Design a protein with these regions (language model features):
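Mature catalytic domains of secreted/periplasmic carbohydrate-active enzymes
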Residues: 1-201
Length: 201
């Protein structure tokens, strides 16, 4: 794929240099949340939404549930907290977008390996058990058709429970005015009575 070729050109082979290593390269040394928020406010914005996490399972805040986050890896900054403080300064409601729900199934591409060439059969770094918490033990989704985005959501019960804990963590840490999920609210019937014990099935 074009993405594979770009990765090899710019970073090296994914069996040797994977996404976890790319995350460590991100420094955000010029990131100025307050300066940007001032520009947005002056341009007419009256609310702000920051990304908490995308499909890559990297968190933009100091999570206790996921060590692959912007405080412990890469920038050394709590990006979400900085955005929240800037929004508060300008009196703007603050929202968080999360894209974690699809990550378990989507991340199956990191379990593959080249079928030809010098690295044929050498597992990509997503197979490294030392990073299983980040890359997931998601072999159940296979790697035969990595370009098929479905299933969008996994049936894996442990991951569903993890997703819910992450949502609770973000809400408790940042008290957002809005929490946006990418797509329909994940995993069908859950949270139906508003309690922690509501069905996740």
């Amino acid at each position: 794929t074009q993405q594979y070729e770009y990765h090899v050109r710019h970073y090296g082979h994914p069996s040797k240099f994977g996404y976890k290593d790319i995350c460590a390269l991100w420094k955000a040394e010029n990131f100025d949340a307050e300066g940007l928020m001032e520009k947005y406010y002056n341009a007419g914005a009256r609310y702000f939404m920051s990304q908490g996490t995308h499909h890559d399972h990297f968190f933009n805040y100091d999570s206790k549930l996921n060590a692959m986050n912007s405080v412990k890896v890469g920038p050394g900054k709590d990006i979400l907290a900085m955005w929240k403080a800037a929004a508060d300064k300008f009196g703007m409601p603050f929202g968080i977008s999360e894209h974690l729900g699809a990550s378990f199934a989507w991340w199956r591409v990191n379990k593959g390996c080249d079928k030809t060439g010098p690295y044929a059969g050498v597992p990509y770094d997503g197979n490294d058990p030392a990073y299983q918490d980040f890359y997931y033990a998601n072999q159940e989704h296979g790697t035969e058709n990595p370009h098929n985005a479905f299933p969008w959501y996994t049936e894996n019960k442990e991951f569903r429970e993890y997703w819910l804990r992450v949502m609770e963590e973000m809400i408790e840490c940042f008290e957002p005015d809005l929490l946006y999920s990418d797509g329909s609210l994940p995993f069908g019937k859950h949270w139906v009575d508003g309690s922690d014990s509501a069905s996740m099935e």
